[in-house]
Amino acid sequence: MMRTLLAERDSERQRVEELRKRADELYLENLRLQVELARYKKWTYGPRADRLSENELAQVLLDFAEELEQLPIPSEEVPPASEPEYELRRVRRRKGRRALANFENLPVSTHVYELSAEERACPCCGVERQEIGTEESWQIEYIPGHFERIRHVRKKYACPSCERAGENPRIEVAAKADTAIEKGFAGPGLLAYIVTSKFADYLPLYRLEDIFERQGFEISRATQSVWCGDVADVVEPLYQRMAERVRQSHVVATDDTVLPMLSVGHTQPARIWVYVGDQENPYNVFDFTLDRGREGPKHFLRDFTQTLLADAYGGYNGVVTGNAITRAGCWSHARRKFVDAEKTAPEIAREAVSLLGKLFAVEKQAKEASVEERLQLRQRQSVPLLAELRQKLLRWKEQLLPKHPMAEAVNYTLSQWAELNVFCSDGAVPIDNNVSEREMKRVVLNRKNSLFVGNPRGGRTAAILATLTSTCRRHEIDPQLYLTQLLVNLPSWPARDLDAWLPDQWKRAHAARCAALGIPAPPTT
């Protein structure tokens, strides 16, 4: 009897221990879900003062997009979610009216208003009144774009003397300028408009189709897509030159995201990558791959031997291993993990975010400094902060359960510690990877409107044309103006002088031409 009772007791103790273990697992899972829910709510409904910064929001968008891309597209519209509760906020005072001097670069059309002969007669004596001055007022007007048919007439010439003698009249036809699309009817301005609308303004081609139809001209989205591919073929030598220049950078920042590609019966999660060059090689170059394997960045970064600034994606290990590449980490990623887990360990989160805030404050102070001055400032101020943070990370790691959400933030930071500290030994390395993440956010916006690419050629086209429009944005260049001139000239441009069409060099040359003519440079962006 006693033996049976002891066996039952041991069995109950074992069951209690199993239940306790299960309760701990559920507790940690509950904390994780609370973190995710708080993250989504803050992203969606957070008050303006508490919402994520632009760079943090970009990272959240990328994380969400990769999860959402795997979900099926619903056949019916999803009912809108219930509106959040509103709270009183300080009303922002509207900015004053912009001075007309800000619009001096616009062309001027003058409308003159005069009195008729009858109105000029003086009502008192009937004598004609003389003009004594004017009153002026200004308006900013929008003149909708329009299509024109451009007729190219090539005159033919023949030798009348040879023709009279019965010989070959030696006919010569005047040369016509090369076109971006051989035997195509789309002019360079129209092609530039389509590329700018899709890759700089994120308009899907079906919307452009509707816009063109309202203006009295039908261009199907299929035709536009073919034209975009043709433009990419024309500018690919320039794209390759920009990629070559990026690989010459001292620091290359990179990031990637999903770019769905149509496949048989489903969409395939292909990838688009961005590689941001430094100030000496100021180009944002995109690349398209069929998957997220390391072969993509490894191929693009061939011959690169400097510093690669990236997130913690393990595929980059294969890029730097065996190569003379230094890998740098992103402190914005680390900070975001502490912010996400704030609800589960608020004291730790506040302490970590406070220290990281001081770290970023040093960067703000060093923003306009030279590379040498920035490095000295980091050595004086950032290194002690990092030493203090590391001590606290090790202490928190001992305090937290391994699966605690805050432990994930602590372990992530410690595992990336060497990469996260590279910026303290090189003043040219940024503290975060926000510059490439901002470019990925724009890819996400374009993907939201266009959903997918049709095939590998479409992905390659997207990468090439996004490279041009993104680099134009970086240099505050009007992509419509730049692309129009590029497509007019590049087909017949000598390959040895290709650098003249790099966006930064084109901008300087364009400004110099305008100055030589004594006219203001056209607006950039």
Language-model features: locations:
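Gly/Pro-rich turn-and-neighbor structural signature
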Residues: F103-E104, E114-E119, P123, L205-D303, ...
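Acidic/histidine-rich catalytic cores and adjacent linkers
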Residues: D303-T305, Y313-G315, E351-T525
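Short helix/loop capping segments that flank catalytic or ligand/cofactor-binding pockets
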Residues: E131-G133, E167-I171, M261-S263, Y283-F286, ...
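Mobile genetic element proteins and their domesticated derivatives, centered on retroelements
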Residues: G46, C122, C159, I194, ...
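Flexible loop/turn segments at secondary-structure boundaries
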Residues: R129-E131, Q139, Y202-L203, A232-V234, ...
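Conserved beta-strand -> loop -> alpha-helix junction used to position metal-binding or nucleic-acid-contacting
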Residues: V251, A312, T321-S354
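Short, amphipathic alpha-helical "recognition" segments used to contact nucleic acids or chromatin
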Residues: G187-D201
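Short, flexible loop/hinge motifs at secondary-structure junctions
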Residues: M1-F185, A253-T254, L498-L502, A516-T525
